[in-house]
Structures are given as C-alpha cells and as structure tokens.
Design a protein with these regions (language model features):
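Phosphate/NTP-binding elements of NTP-utilizing enzymes
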Residues: 2-188
Length: 188
C-alpha cells in the first residue's frame, strides 16, 4: 500500500489527540486502507499491534461517523477471546473520551456512539443489529458465513466498512479473500 504523507498526518493527528494512540507504520497503512476502501484485508505478523490498531480504528470511525447513533463492533473467534484480547484496550482508549463501559455486555458508550465486542462463536448475538463498521479479528478462524449471512446485512443499510484482520495460517478462506483482494481485475 502506498502512503500519501498528507493522509498519514491526518490519521496521526486524529488518533493521537483523542486517545493517545500513536500508530506505527504498518498500522498507518491499515488506517489509510480503511479510509480509502469499504472492505479491507490485513495479514499481520504476530506482535504487530493489530488489536490496538483495530480498536483505535473503531474509535476513530465512531468519532467521525455522521450518522445517528453509530454502532461498531470488534469480533473475535470466541467471546472469551474478544474479552481477553480487546476489552482492556477498548476501555483504556475510550476513557479520555468519557467512555462508559458495560462489563456484562462488553460494550463502551461514548459521545452518543457505541462499540461492542462479540464472539463469532455466537453469531445470533449479531443478528438484527446495524453496524457502521466492524473488525473481524483472526478471520481465518471464523466461519466465512458469519460475514456473508450476518455481518454484511448488518453493514448494508448504513454502508458500513469491514476490516478482515489476522495472522497467516496457511491456505484457508482468509488467504482466499486476500488473494481476491490483491487481484487488480477485482477492483471496483
């Protein structure tokens, strides 16, 4: 992904001022990709900071969403993984924004916005909601029907975005999605 200095500075200033998050180069590439595309795949090495990046992208998108009552979601393969991996980051990074954490529902409300954590092991919890954006972490460990049957409809009416993020785990539906995204004939 090529980076335009102006775009990088935009991302840095918004993220740094509101949450204290300072993205590293690979994280900046992900933020720029989401700014420029509705669907984004990101294959990340271990310890790259993908969860911190993902949580801060959700916060940034919530803050900049002009629709009424924005709702965004972070989805891990299991509910317990979402809590263990991302819950602390979500609470910490929204605290400066007056975030109110609901421990039993794993959600934070701030400034009329909501970010919730879910597990792909309980897809019914995502049915019937609308989303302005979502992150599907470790997409290779999630059944692909979660996106096609549950998340895409939740994103459709508000033209929400999705970030498919994870670490490489051989040939699976995440690799197929990335290969599809990398093929220039699939643009548009």
């Amino acid at each position: 992904m090529e980076n335009n200095t102006e775009d990088i500075n935009e991302v840095e200033s918004i993220e740094t001022v509101t949450t204290g998050y300072e993205p590293r180069e690979p994280q900046k590439e992900i933020h720029k990709a989401i700014k420029d595309n509705r669907w984004v795949t990101a294959i990340c090495h271990r310890r790259m900071g993908k969860t911190v990046c993902a949580i801060n992208q959700l916060i940034h998108s919530a803050l900049n969403c002009t629709k009424e009552s924005p709702q965004l979601a972070y989805i891990a393969p299991t509910y317990s993984q979402a809590k263990r991996i991302a819950w602390g980051y979500l609470k910490d990074y929204t605290r400066p924004l007056g975030g109110i954490a609901n421990e039993s529902e794993l959600r934070v409300d701030f400034l009329g916005r909501r970010i919730s954590l879910y597990g792909a092991d309980s897809p019914d919890a995502l049915r019937g909601i609308y989303l302005d954006g979502c992150v599907i972490d470790e997409y290779g460990d999630v059944h692909p029907s979660l996106f096609t049957e549950v998340l895409r409809p939740a994103l459709s009416d508000r033209l929400g975005w999705a970030l498919f993020i994870g670490t490489p785990k051989g040939s699976n539906h995440f690799k197929e999605l990335r290969d599809f995204a990398d093929n220039p004939s699939n643009e548009g």
